[in-house]
């Protein structure tokens, strides 16, 4: 029987929960919210698990988004996943939101995933055939004018187009808990808290032209 995974995501503008088994979605719930995840997440977990007709003893692991994204959302998701995993003695899988966008893209070439920071710069990472070819980084719009041969995807694309005129865009919906569950099926879970990917400017080198 395919292992069942409970997946949680509240790293960006939505909060979502899914129970998946391989590529199959057993139950899923999502809600748009930029705040209030701490109050909404556990009731959503209870609802989704009830509809999936699973107990924690039926799960192989818990998957959670590690960001980058909303600091509060990432922190809430990781804390919830860690608490549930400890209570049920389950391992965890952390999934980068940047990698999740690349995974979701119906695009096999060179892709630059660009996510909103709500500031003057962007979270970003470079991929080729869905595999990372750079570490995650923070960059301003001028940096992306130096990139040649890359398409762009992510929730920062619209602002990037406005700032730089970039036109090669891969249309990719922002990932949700379903995507995290599918990705986690191919990863090795561990009995430790996944590390958050906050990418604050103080922790990285700001790329400029």
Predicted segment positions?
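Oxyanion-binding and handling regions
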Residues: 1-25, 36-39, 93-209
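Short, well-ordered amphipathic alpha-helical segments that serve as non-catalytic structural scaffolds
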Residues: 37-52, 98
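Phosphate-handling active-site elements
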Residues: 50-58, 86-95
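DPxDG-like acidic metal-binding loop motif
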Residues: 61-92
């Amino acid at each position: 029987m395919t292992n069942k995974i409970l997946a949680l995501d509240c790293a960006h503008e939505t909060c979502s929960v899914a129970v998946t088994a391989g590529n199959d979605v057993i139950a899923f719930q999502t809600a748009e919210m930029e705040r209030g995840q701490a109050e909404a997440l556990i009731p959503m977990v209870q609802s989704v698990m009830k509809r999936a007709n699973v107990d924690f003893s039926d799960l192989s692991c818990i998957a959670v988004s590690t960001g980058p994204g909303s600091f509060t959302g990432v922190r809430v998701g990781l804390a919830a996943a860690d608490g549930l995993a400890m209570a049920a003695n389950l391992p965890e899988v952390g999934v980068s939101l940047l990698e999740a966008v690349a995974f979701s893209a119906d695009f096999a070439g060179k892709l630059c995933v660009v996510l909103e920071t709500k500031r003057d710069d962007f979270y970003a990472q470079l991929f080729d055939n869905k595999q990372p070819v750079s570490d995650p980084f923070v960059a301003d719009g001028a940096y992306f004018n130096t990139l040649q041969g890359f398409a762009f995807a992510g929730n920062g694309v619209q602002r990037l187009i406005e700032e730089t005129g970039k036109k090669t865009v891969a249309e990719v919906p922002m990932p949700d808990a379903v995507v995290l569950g599918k990705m986690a099926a191919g990863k090795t879970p561990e009995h430790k808290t996944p590390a958050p990917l906050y990418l604050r400017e103080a922790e990285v080198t700001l790329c400029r032209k």
